[in-house]
A protein has these predicted regions:
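Phosphate/pyrophosphate- and phosphate-bearing ligand-binding catalytic cores of soluble enzymes
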Residues: 28-32, 55-56, 62-64, 107, ...
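Active-site glycine-rich loop that binds ribose-phosphate moieties when present
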Residues: 173-197, 208-220
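Compositionally biased, low-complexity flexible segments
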Residues: 1-9, 16-18
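Beta-strand segments within the central parallel beta-sheet cores of soluble alpha/beta enzyme folds
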Residues: 161, 195-196, 341-344
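Anion-binding (especially nucleotide phosphate/pyrophosphate-binding) glycine-rich loop
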Residues: 38-173, 177
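Short polybasic amphipathic segments
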Residues: 126-127, 195-199
C-alpha cells in the first residue's frame, strides 16, 4: 500500500520551501473557466443553444478520464462540426468562457468546476473515399476510426490504438506511438497521415489549413498557442494487409497494457509531466522513490511513475499537491524542473 499524505498539509509545507515556486507556477496554466459568470450572460447563451442538448450545473468529471472536477455552469453537446463552431460563436458573443471537451484525457478540472460553457464534441461523421482519403469530424473517437479503417483495409492509423482521444485531440497533441515490434525505435506521429483540416480560427473564421499551418511538433501544434478549434480532418491512408494491421493492434495494446495502468480500473489523465530529452520524467520521479506515494486518493502509479491515478475519491487539490510534491522532490534531488503536460481547466480555488 502506498504512503498516504494529507493534501492541505503538503500544500502548507510546500509554501515554505523551494518547491513552492514550482507549485505556484503550475497554477498559471489555468486560464479558462476560472471566474464566475453573470447569470444574465449564462441565460443569454442558454437561450441561443438547442435546449434538448443543454444541461445546467452539469457534472463533467464523468466525461474526463481522471473522473475529477466540479460541474460546468453549462454543458452542451455539439453533434456536428458546424454546431461546435456555432456554439463557440454564441459563447464569445456573450463574453462567456468556453472549453471544448473530447474524451477528457490529458486535463485536470478544478474542484470548483468550469465557469462558462463546456462543449462536448460529439461531431463524428466520417466520409471514406476510394483513394485512401477519409474526412473525419473532430469528435470522432480514435478507437472507432481505427477499427473501421482496419476493417476496410486502410493502413496508417492502427499504430495509435489504445490511446484515449478524439480525432480533434489527436491533432491537437500530434498523437504519437513507437513504431511496430520488434524494433520500437522510431516515434510515429499522426502528422504522418494528416493531409488537411478545417478549423474555426480564433477570430471566428472557418477555413481549411495544411500541415504547415498546424505546425506539428512533439506534443505540440498551433492549437496549443491559439484558440483555433479543429472541426474536421482529412487523413491520407494507404492500402494495408488486414492480418498485419490486426497484429500491430494486438501488439500495441499488449505493450501499453504492460506499462500503463488501465483506465477502467485506475482513472488517470495520462502522462503528467512533459518529456525531458534524454531523461524520462517518470524515471526521475521513480528514482525519488515516489511510486505508490499518495495524497488523499491521488496516487503516483506503481506501474508508471509519470502517471497519477484516482483511487476513487481524489480531488483536484489532491492531484495538484501530488504534482507539486513530485516537482519539489525531483528538483531537490536532480535539479530538474518538471513541467506539467496536462491542462488545468476551471476553478481551483474552491474550498
Amino acid at each position: 500500500m502506498g504512503r498516504r499524505v494529507d493534501a492541505r498539509r503538503v500544500q502548507r509545507q510546500l509554501a515554505r520551501d523551494a518547491g513552492a515556486v514550482l507549485f505556484g507556477a503550475m497554477t498559471t496554466a489555468t486560464t479558462r473557466g476560472t471566474s464566475p459568470v453573470p447569470p444574465a450572460a449564462l441565460d443569454a447563451v442558454a437561450g441561443r443553444l438547442v435546449r434538448a442538448r443543454l444541461t445546467r450545473a452539469a457534472p463533467i468529471a464523468p466525461y474526463t478520464t481522471f473522473r475529477i472536477g466540479g460541474p460546468a455552469d453549462l454543458l452542451y453537446d455539439a453533434d456536428t462540426g458546424d454546431d461546435l463552431a456555432e456554439a463557440i460563436d454564441i459563447a464569445e458573443s456573450e463574453r462567456v468562457d468556453w472549453f471544448v471537451l473530447g474524451l477528457g484525457a490529458n486535463i485536470l478540472v478544478g474542484d470548483g468546476g468550469f465557469h462558462g460553457l463546456v462543449i462536448r464534441n460529439r461531431a463524428s461523421h466520417v466520409a471514406w473515399h476510394s483513394d485512401g482519403r477519409c474526412i473525419v469530424e473532430s469528435g470522432t473517437v480514435m478507437a472507432d476510426l481505427i477499427r473501421d479503417a482496419v476493417a476496410a483495409g486502410w493502413s496508417g492509423l492502427e499504430h495509435y490504438v489504445g490511446i484515449p482521444s478524439t480525432v480533434g485531440g489527436a491533432i491537437w497533441q500530434n498523437l504519437h506511438f513507437l513504431s511496430p515490434a520488434p524494433d520500437r525505435q522510431r516515434t510515429m506521429f499522426i502528422a504522418e497521415v494528416f493531409e488537411a483540416c478545417r478549423i474555426r480560427r480564433e477570430n471566428g473564421e472557418r477555413t481549411a489549413v495544411d500541415a504547415a499551418y498546424v505546425g506539428f511538433g512533439y506534443d505540440d501544434t498551433v492549437f496549443h498557442h491559439t484558440r483555433d478549434v479543429v472541426l474536421d480532418v482529412t487523413f491520407r491512408l494507404t492500402p494495408g494487409d488486414p492480418a498485419a494491421m490486426h497484429r500491430i493492434l494486438q501488439e500495441n495494446l499488449s505493450w501499453r497494457g504492460a506499462r500503463h495502468p488501465w483506465l477502467e480500473h485506475h482513472p488517470s489523465a495520462g502522462s503528467i509531466f512533459k518529456k525531458i530529452e534524454g531523461v524520462g520524467a517518470g524515471r526521475l520521479v521513480d528514482q525519488c522513490g515516489l511510486k505508490g506515494f499518495r495524497i488523499g486518493d491521488a496516487q503516483i502509479s506503481h506501474i508508471h511513475a509519470n502517471i497519477m491515478v484516482n483511487l476513487g475519491r481524489a480531488s483536484a487539490a489532491d492531484v495538484r499537491a501530488l504534482i507539486a510534491h513530485a516537482q519539489a522532490a525531483v528538483f531537490d534531488q536532480f535539479g530538474q524542473r518538471l513541467e506539467p503536460e496536462i491542462g488545468y481547466i476551471g476553478d481551483f480555488n474552491a474550498r
